[in-house]
Each structure stands twice: as C-alpha cells, then as structure tokens.
Amino acid sequence: MSAPLASTPAFNAAELARVVAAAPHRLLFFGGATAVLLSMSWWALVLIGQRSGAAAMPLPLLPAGWAHAIGMQYQALPMFMFGFLLTVFPRWMGLKAYTRWHYLPVGGSLLLGYLLFHGGLLGV
C-alpha cells in the first residue's frame, strides 16, 4: 500500500519574500525573470494586435521594437548582471557579504523602474 499523499501547503507570500530576499542573486534574478516574462507577454500582445488588426494594446510613444530594446538592454539584463556581481564581488575582493539592506533597495528600485516603464508603455 502506498502512503497517502501529503497535502500541499497553502501559498505563503511572506515566506516567498523571505526566501527571495535571502541573497542578492535570488532577489535580482527573480526581478530579471519577472521582467523577461512581462516583456514576453507585452511583446506577444503587441504582435497579436498587429497581426489581427485589432487594437489589443494602446500604442506606446516609442515604436515597439525600440521599447523592447530599451527594456531588455537597460532594465532586464542589468538585474541579472547585478545579481551575479553583488553575489561574487565580496568573495572576489575579500569583503564581507552584503546584508539585505545593501541589495534590497537595488533590486526593488530596478524592478519598480521596470514596472513603471511597462506601465508607461501601456498608457497607465
């Protein structure tokens, strides 16, 4: 006989936030992954709107290709780079590891800037 399946615990946002904020690479990689997924969703909606002829998305002030290039190059990619660098620089330079108060403002500001950028593209 097999043992009964253990019940899946309920989603706990506080626990997720604690785990994500436990190290610089987790926070910034999470922000970068979120940025990439949001960009893919936005880009898919833009392309579907252009292909179908329906006005599914408000037209951004920038051409969609330029907005994609700016968002990926200057906002999504730096989150991955900073996540890596904030994790390895202390070890490479013989410094003590950063505390949460060093990298939480960095990750939060980068993600907030990215969300505001996409909010502007959506006309919010």
Regions found by a protein language model. Name each.
Residues 1-124:
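Hydrophobic alpha-helical transmembrane segments of multi-pass integral membrane proteins
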